[in-house]
């Protein structure tokens, strides 16, 4: 896909990091603290402390797989690539069956990222966020991996239900050497295919970490699918689980 600079629109698919960002149960709260200010000290400096699998972040295989690749070992060509966006807003939240995406699986090219759009970013910071997103089920995940995708992403907190204790879907993806992008936003602004840039922090031997995800959209491709009216979602607490 070739995009001219004069026609490109950059869509920020990452949430802000701050002390109020939603967390899985049991995760220590973040601490973003300014310890020097321009008025008092002549310069500003801050301290950031947070768990690496919070906010918009990327899972490396080492997150769930003993001996799996760490984040700094993943080729950048797998993180700066193209994405195929599956609009799942007409599908019930939860695992997406293969038959729900079968009409588009043939569009997948080797090294694409598969992104699942639920419009769930509108629920960020509410109890509904932990129940109202879509992610590929086991059969769909295997089919996408067989097509050669480099990873998967979605506008929700995990590749598995938040109360999972087996992490089956994490293990399918990470066991195949793929990456997982969690807590994305603004996927509703993306067309069916676009360029994608995933820029994680370069931390040695990281099992995952914060990531800035930018979609590069050719204006000729349109502005994405307009938001559906909000689906009714049941509020729920967020029990612990892998993210």
What label would you give each PLM region?
Residues 1-243:
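Active-/binding-site microenvironments in catalytic and ligand-binding cores
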């Amino acid at each position: 896909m070739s995009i001219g600079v004069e026609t490109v629109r950059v869509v920020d698919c990452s949430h802000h990091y701050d002390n109020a960002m939603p967390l899985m149960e049991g995760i220590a709260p973040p601490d973003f603290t300014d310890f020097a200010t321009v008025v008092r000290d002549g310069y500003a400096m801050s301290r950031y402390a947070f768990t690496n699998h919070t906010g918009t972040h990327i899972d490396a295989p080492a997150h769930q797989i003993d001996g799996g690749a760490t984040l700094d070992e993943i080729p950048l060509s797998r993180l700066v690539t193209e994405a195929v966006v599956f609009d799942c807003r007409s599908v019930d939240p939860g695992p997406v069956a293969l038959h729900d995406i079968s009409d588009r699986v043939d569009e997948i090219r080797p090294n694409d990222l598969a992104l699942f759009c639920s419009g769930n970013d509108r629920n960020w910071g509410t109890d509904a966020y932990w129940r109202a997103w879509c992610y590929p089920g086991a059969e769909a995940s295997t089919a996408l991996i067989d097509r050669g995708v480099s990873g998967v992403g979605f506008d929700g907190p995990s590749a598995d239900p938040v109360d999972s204790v087996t992490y089956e879907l994490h293990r399918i993806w990470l066991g195949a050497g793929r990456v997982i992008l969690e807590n994305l936003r603004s996927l509703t602004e993306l067309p069916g295919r676009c360029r994608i840039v995933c820029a994680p922090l370069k931390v040695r031997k990281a099992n995952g970490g914060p990531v800035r995800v930018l979609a590069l959209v050719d204006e000729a491709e349109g502005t994405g699918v307009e938001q559906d009216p909000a689906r009714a979602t049941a509020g729920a607490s967020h029990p612990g689980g892998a993210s």
